[in-house]
């Protein structure tokens, strides 16, 4: 892969099907027009890839708009390219893109973990109330208890989870499918498992408390 070079004129002579077959082998493009750049972006997208396009000129704007992630130069880039892009490199340093990807992945992971923590705790509360209702026992939580749990014992740890720094292996992970939401099958299974375990621990303490007070 990456052993071919193509000029704009040669690209014009290719059909979309021919370009799709060759695009993964082309590493250098020369004298390409804005239309050529759009075709290159579309060819990679048809292969199921998430495409990022960098540019700084007016002629780059259409492809920047077409790409999944258009990246414009903040210092040397034109206003047209900046308006078309979804991300602007304020220092014109391509290494910053890698840092941005790492930060984005870390933010997404932290949000997901914080949501998982909150939903697991709420699941445990629901299961505990359901258990005591079915068993004919006194409700384990008063409204003020639930308010305290949601405002303090859940919110503060969730904020801490949301501020976790990125680890060194974050960029080694495979990119996630952009069509996949947060509530995946694994997420739901983990949420229910943790919620059940917390509910069991809470109800065990509840029964111990009842037995102790009755003794």
Task: Specify the residue positions occupied by each region the protein language model found.
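Membrane-embedded transport module
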Residues: 2-53, 67, 72-215
């Amino acid at each position: 892969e990456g052993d071919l070079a193509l000029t704009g004129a040669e690209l014009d002579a290719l059909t979309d099907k021919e370009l799709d077959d060759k695009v993964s082998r082309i590493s250098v493009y020369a004298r390409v027009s804005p239309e050529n750049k759009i075709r290159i972006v579309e060819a990679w997208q048809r292969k199921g890839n998430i495409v990022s396009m960098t540019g700084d000129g007016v002629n780059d704007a259409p492809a920047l708009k077409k790409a999944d992630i258009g990246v414009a130069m903040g210092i040397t880039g034109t206003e047209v390219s900046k308006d078309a892009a979804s991300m602007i490199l304020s220092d014109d340093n391509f290494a910053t893109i890698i840092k941005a990807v790492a930060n984005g992945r870390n933010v997404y992971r932290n949000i997901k973990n914080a949501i998982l923590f909150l939903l697991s705790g709420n699941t445990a509360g629901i299961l505990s109330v359901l258990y005591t209702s079915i068993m004919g026992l006194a409700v384990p939580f008063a409204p003020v208890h639930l308010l305290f749990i949601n405002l303090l014992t859940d919110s503060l740890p969730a904020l801490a989870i949301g501020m976790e720094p990125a680890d060194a292996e974050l960029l080694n992970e495979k990119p996630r499918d952009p069509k996949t939401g947060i509530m995946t099958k694994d997420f739901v299974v983990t949420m229910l498992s943790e919620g059940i375990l917390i509910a069991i621990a809470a109800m065990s303490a509840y029964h111990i408390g009842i037995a102790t007070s009755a003794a």
